[in-house]
Amino acid sequence: MGMSIKIRTILLERKMTIKMLAEKIGTTGNNLSNKLARDNFSEQELLEIAEALGCDYSASFTMRDTGKTI
């Protein structure tokens, strides 16, 4: 599942619009809509979005052969 789908799912659960989220992170609704369409976010943007949505965000890699998460 891409980040855009995850963000849109949380927006639905929080009863928020893209415009509302955009205002919270200091961008325009059009800019955020474009990023969601491309599923193209920097790590910093994801942290800001998570904070605005009242969520924790962590990025990690899990090795398939050992299950070790880095």
Features from the language model and the residues they span:
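A short, Lys/Arg-rich alpha-helix, primarily the initiator
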Residues: 1-16
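Polybasic/polar functional segments that serve as interface/processing modules
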Residues: 2-4, 24, 49
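The alpha-helix within a helix-turn-helix
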Residues: 11, 22, 50
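Short alpha-helical DNA-recognition segment
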Residues: 15-30
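Helix-turn-helix DNA-binding elements, focusing on the entry/boundary residues of the two helices
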Residues: 18, 43-46
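Short, charged recognition helix plus adjacent turn
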Residues: 23, 60-70
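Recognition helix of helix-turn-helix/homeodomain-like DNA-binding domains
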Residues: 26-41
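DNA major-groove recognition helix of helix-turn-helix/homeodomain DNA-binding modules
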Residues: 45-58
